[in-house]
Amino acid sequence: MSLQKSNKITPFLTFDRQKWAELRKSVPLKLTEQDLKPLLGFNEDLSLDEVSTIYLPLARLINYYIEENLKRQTVLHRFLDVASPKVPYIISIAGSVSVGKSTSARILQALLSQWPSERKVDLITTDGFLYPLTTLQEKDLLKRKGFPESYDIHRLIQFVSDIKSGKRHIQAPIYSHLTYDIIPDQYNVVDQPDIVILEGLNVLQSGMNYPSSPHNVFVSDFVDFSIYVDADEDLLKEWYVARFLKFRRSAFSDPNAYFHHYSKLSEQEAIRTASSIWDEINGLNLKQNILPSRERANLILIKGEDHAIQTVKLRK
């Protein structure tokens, strides 16, 4: 058996790092150290060993699911007697602020675009579907940024619905972490790729997170395979504070940065500020909205102290 035994009733198979790595089989590692460097997050130091151990087996699994999905589409279109439109396979990646969702998404994008054949893989972040800064200010939602009510959920649902309808030239708004706002009149265009990776805090959330929404469908209804990147909250807070301190010395020093004023803080002041932001905003959002969605994922990646993934949980 290549999984951990447990008496607890669970819908997941649980693998330790070594057992999961064995499932790579013969999947080739085509990434080099040079390829990996631009994929890493601002505060992460991830090795090629992590790619081989965790992400290559995951790429192999996802490729099996994609093959089965294509077969199901063919059966449905044959039954309906209609031409088969090109419908992208949607992978969602959820998890807390500072857990490393973006890095996981970029690594998967690189791997899935290279093997077993060349594919077009688009990566979209749901940050682009946040309300503009002026709207958040008008709604008094600046301290709720990242919470469900801070997103234009209707626009996001329409976006993923259009992808699954096989539509072409679909526009996704672009978010700037420098200005802390949507960039006006700039878009990423999704034009029938083979795979779309949708990364964000809210991609696993459902009706309970949007009680006032008139929709009876949500982003998760359009997703083919969902991933949740997990870690203990103490680690998440530690990583958030460390990232904040690095930003204070780099991105925040740009006079155009929304958080430029933080660059003038002393290190102790910056630590207190980052801790307060975590406790009042990010940690609260994690407990109320993000963590409760974890068990809906098809796969959970659990990180340890060094950002390395120690445990993988796969839905049966």
From Swiss-Prot:
Gene designation per UniProt: coaA
Protein name listed in UniProt: Pantothenate kinase
Pathway: Cofactor biosynthesis; coenzyme A biosynthesis; CoA from (R)-pantothenate: step 1/5
Organism: Actinobacillus pleuropneumoniae serotype 5b (strain L20)
Positions of ATP binding: G95, S96, V97, S98, V99, G100, K101, S102
NCBIfam families (alphabetical): panK_bact (TIGR00554)
GO biological process: coenzyme A biosynthetic process
Highest taxon of the lineage: Bacteria
HAMAP family: Pantothen_kinase_1
PANTHER family: URIDINE KINASE (PTHR10285)
Keywords of the record: ATP-binding, Coenzyme A biosynthesis, Cytoplasm, Kinase, Nucleotide-binding, Transferase
Subcellular location: Cytoplasm
Family listed: Belongs to the prokaryotic pantothenate kinase family.
Gene3D superfamilies per UniProt: P-loop containing nucleotide triphosphate hydrolases (3.40.50.300)
An example Gene Ontology molecular-function term: ATP binding
EC number: 2.7.1.33
Catalytic activity: (R)-pantothenate + ATP = (R)-4'-phosphopantothenate + ADP + H(+)
Cellular compartments per GO CC: cytoplasm
Pfam family, any one: PRK
